[in-house]
Amino acid sequence: MNYTPNPIDTSAVSLESELMQLVEYMAKNNHDVWAKERIAQGWKYGPCRRDDLKEHPCLVPYELLPEEEKIYDRNSAMETLKAVCALGYTILPSPDTK
C-alpha cells in the first residue's frame, strides 16, 4: 500500500488567545476518551508500559500526566481547532461562557 498523508494546511492559522482555555478542555477530553477506551479494553495503570500486562503509566487523570504528555494532547487539540478554522468555520464561545 502506498499512502501519502495529506493533512489540512493549518500553517496560516493562528488561534486567538481566548481559545487557549478551549484547547486545554479539549486536551483533557482527548486524554479522557483515550483512557476510557483503554480501560474498556482491559488496560490499567502501571508505572511503565507493559503491553503483555496491559499496563500504561498514562492511565491517570489528565492533571497528573507528565507535562510532555499534556503537550502532546494540547498540540492535538490545537491542530484540530486550527483545521476547523482552515476549513472556514468560526469558533465562538456560547454566551454562557463569557
Can you describe what each PLM-predicted range is?
Residues 1-98:
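Alpha-helical propensity feature that highlights long, continuous alpha-helices across diverse contexts
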